[in-house]
């Protein structure tokens, strides 16, 4: 009988384990909520749905303090710290009145429930669509409720001529249900690019598409699940999407330049027969392609910002999810009976480690933004500091949780402090760089020369590089030795090589490592449209070099001729000595000495006169 019963017992055990695992997964996704409609039972959320409360006193609760106490009463196993009205609405079925069990006809009600927040407050990650902007408003002196924060976000977007896409609370106050800031996403009411702007007739080639019909760039922006599983981590997904975006922009700009050069060639031919008409056509051509160029320029900037914002959102979402999981593990370890020191220490250090990763990512992103777009970096510097302060506050709250059990705190706190000491110097150096004020670059004067052919002037007019591009002094970048901890297997990506590579590509003056020069132009388009100017400058430099070389050679020849002529005219100096044949007789030597003294032999003189 024993062997026949054992398989059935194993099936029951495995089934119970499966049910327990399913309940654990569902509890991870479960978020406590309550909803109220006056004269109807209060509803609270459970993993299986919504459950009514027959207590009439809880039917019409409105004050945040009362709602917080109600949440703590309904969910005693959760650490409820605050309440927040949801930014979305939910439909609750079968919401009947008191003493009514079924009301199918009029039982569905759509309300905005209240979220019972568990653990430390964390602001939501907002999606930033294309051509939209993300901003925030924070006044620590004022604490507002949900509706007032909503009005603040709408007024801020309305002041920009935009509409509010979404918003979320930024920082909680001491009073439940009140917050001292709001973050929001504003979107334009109309399209960014005017419809009247003419674009090239033929569209640029389409990048290669994935198996589901989307290219890497589009799939990345849409968050396609199949695309997400194609790459190992977020860094690879971002680089693949960026590569496709840059390819698309290059092909689009190259096509525009080809069309423009073809139109310029037609104007040159027209100039031979009708110069006046050619001038008019050239002016019209310049204005038209100037609009196209600036439209493409703005579109490229918007696409790059959208890609970077999506990348930041993915990373922040990963970090927030990881924090939530580790926070729940820490809470479970603290509430365990009896609490285990090893689990508490492991959960606390893991959570602090993720928070420190969030810090390092924020530092790296801000430094990259400061190198590529100083103006945008200056605009978000205050928000970056607030984000870092929020991280520090959450870490302090986790450490305060340990104080609930002094014995456990005494055992695990030294190891946690030792672990946090690894990041102390890193945070200090990073904060020093973050608060560093960038000096204003000195602008150097730009000398321009008027070209004889108006087509080259039109090129500068279209691209806007004739007067807008102002070279600045290249200065060595003040690099500080910041030792960053190694990225372990839990890390989603190591962004530092990507940031360095992106900085080099984005800044046209980054030719050598350690130098920064800000140039006020769109590098990719401006480099392509200035090919004619580069060729003209190269030709002029070649002619000038040949002329200078010819003059130098001519001077060398003249000097050589003069020196040679002077040398041939130089007389031989004997200094009173005459070379005498060593084999001569003493008489011949005596005669030679007499001749050297001025004596002339009469016999020789006689014969010389006879020969003449």
Swiss-Prot record:
Q: Where is this region: Disordered?
A: 251-276, 437-490
Q: Where in the cell is it found?
A: Cell membrane; Cell projection, Axon
Q: Where's the E1 domain?
A: 28-189
Any GO BP annotation: central nervous system development
Q: Name one Pfam family in it.
A: APP_E2
Q: Which Cys pairs does UniProt list as disulfide-bonded? A: 38-60, 71-116, 96-103, 132-187, 143-173, 157-186
Task: List the molecular function annotations (GO) for this entry.
Answer: heparin binding; transition metal ion binding
Where do we find the motif YENPXY motif here?
A: 599-604
Arranged from A to Z, the UniProt key words for this protein are:
Cell membrane, Cell projection, Disulfide bond, Glycoprotein, Membrane, Signal, Transmembrane, Transmembrane helix
- Residues on Cytoplasmic side: 564-612
Q: Just give the chief location class.
A: membrane
Offer a single GO CC term for the protein: axon
**Per UniProt, what is the membrane topology?**
Single-pass type I membrane protein
Q: State whether keyword Iron-sulfur applies.
A: no
Cite the record's Basic and acidic residues compositional bias ranges. Answer: 439-453, 470-483
Annotated region GFLD subdomain: the residues are 28-122
InterPro entries recorded: Amyloid_Cu-bd_sf, Amyloid_glyco, Amyloid_glyco_Cu-bd, Amyloid_glyco_E2_domain, Amyloid_glyco_extra, Amyloid_glyco_heparin-bd, Amyloid_glyco_heparin-bd_sf, Amyloid_glyco_intracell_CS
Tell me where the signal peptide lies. Answer: 1-21
Query: What PANTHER family does the annotation carry?
Result: ALZHEIMER'S DISEASE BETA-AMYLOID RELATED, AMYLOID-BETA-LIKE PROTEIN
Summarizing the function annotation, the protein's role is: Acts as a kinesin I membrane receptor, thereby playing a role in axonal anterograde transport of cargo towards synapses in axons.
Q: What's the name of the protein? A: Amyloid-beta precursor-like protein
């Amino acid at each position: 009988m024993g062997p026949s019963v054992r398989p059935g017992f194993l099936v029951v055990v495995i089934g119970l384990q499966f049910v327990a695992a399913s309940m654990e997964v569902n509890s991870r996704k479960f978020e406590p909520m309550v909803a109220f409609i006056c004269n109807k039972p209060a509803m609270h959320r459970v993993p299986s749905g919504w459950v009514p409360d027959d207590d009439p006193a809880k039917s019409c609760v409105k004050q945040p303090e009362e709602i917080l106490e109600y949440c703590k009463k309904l969910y005693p196993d959760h650490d409820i710290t605050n309440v927040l009205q949801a930014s979305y609405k939910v439909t609750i079925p079968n919401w009947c009145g008191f003493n009514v069990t079924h009301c199918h006809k009029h039982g569905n009600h759509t309300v905005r429930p209240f979220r019972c927040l568990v653990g430390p407050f964390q602001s939501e990650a907002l999606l930033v669509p294309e051509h939209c902007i993300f901003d925030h408003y924070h006044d620590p002196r004022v604490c507002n409720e949900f509706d007032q924060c909503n009005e603040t976000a709408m007024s801020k977007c309305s002041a920009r001529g935009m509409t509010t896409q979404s918003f979320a609370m930024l920082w909680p106050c001491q009073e439940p249900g009140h917050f001292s800031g709001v973050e929001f996403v504003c979107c334009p009411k109309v399209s960014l690019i005017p419809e009247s702007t003419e674009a090239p007739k033929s569209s640029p080639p389409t990048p290669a598409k994935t198996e589901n019909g989307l290219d890497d760039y589009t799939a990345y922006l849409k968050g396609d699940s199949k695309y997400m599983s194609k790459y190992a981590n977020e860094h690879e997904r971002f680089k693949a999407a960026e590569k496709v975006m840059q390819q698309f922009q290059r092909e689009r700009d190259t096509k525009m330049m080809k069309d423009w050069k073809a139109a310029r060639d037609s104007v040159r031919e027209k100039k031979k027969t009708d110069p006046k008409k050619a001038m008019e056509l050239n002016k019209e051509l310049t204005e038209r392609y100037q609009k196209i160029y600036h439209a493409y320029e703005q579109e490229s900037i918007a696409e790059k910002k959208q890609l970077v914002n999506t990348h930041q959102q993915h990373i922040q979402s990963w970090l927030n999810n990881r924090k939530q999981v580790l926070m729940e593990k820490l809470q479970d370890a603290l509430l365990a009976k009896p609490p285990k020191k090893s689990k508490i220490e492991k959960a606390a250090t893991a959570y602090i480690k993720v928070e420190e990763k969030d810090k390092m990512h924020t530092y790296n992103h801000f430094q990259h933004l400061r190198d590529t777009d100083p103006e945008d970096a200056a605009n978000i510097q205050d928000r970056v500091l607030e984000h870092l302060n929020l991280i520090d506050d959450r870490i302090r709250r986790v450490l305060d949780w340990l104080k609930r059990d002094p014995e456990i705190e005494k055992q695990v706190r030294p190891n946690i402090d030792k672990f946090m000491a690894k990041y102390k110097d890193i945070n200090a150096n990073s904060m020093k760089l973050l608060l560093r004020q960038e000096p204003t670059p000195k602008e150097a004067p730009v000398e321009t020369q008027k070209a004889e052919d108006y087509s080259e002037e039109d090129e500068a007019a279209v691209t806007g590089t004739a007067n807008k591009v102002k070279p600045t002094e290249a200065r060595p970048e003040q690099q500080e030795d910041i030792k960053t901890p190694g990225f372990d297997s839990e890390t989603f990506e190591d962004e530092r090589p990507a940031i360095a590579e992106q900085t080099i590509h984005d800044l046209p003056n980054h030719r050598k490592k350690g130098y920064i020069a800000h140039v006020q132009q769109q590098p990719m388009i401006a480099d392509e449209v200035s090919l004619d100017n580069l060729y003209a400058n190269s030709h002029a430099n070649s002619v000038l070099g040949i002329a200078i070389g010819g003059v130098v050679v001519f001077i060398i020849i003249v000097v050589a001729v003069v020196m040679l002529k002077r040398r041939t005219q130089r007389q031989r100096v004997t200094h009173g000595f005459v070379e005498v044949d060593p084999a001569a007789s003493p008489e011949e030597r005596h005669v030679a000495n007499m001749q050297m003294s001025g004596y002339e032999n009469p016999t020789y003189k006689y014969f010389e006169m006879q020969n003449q």
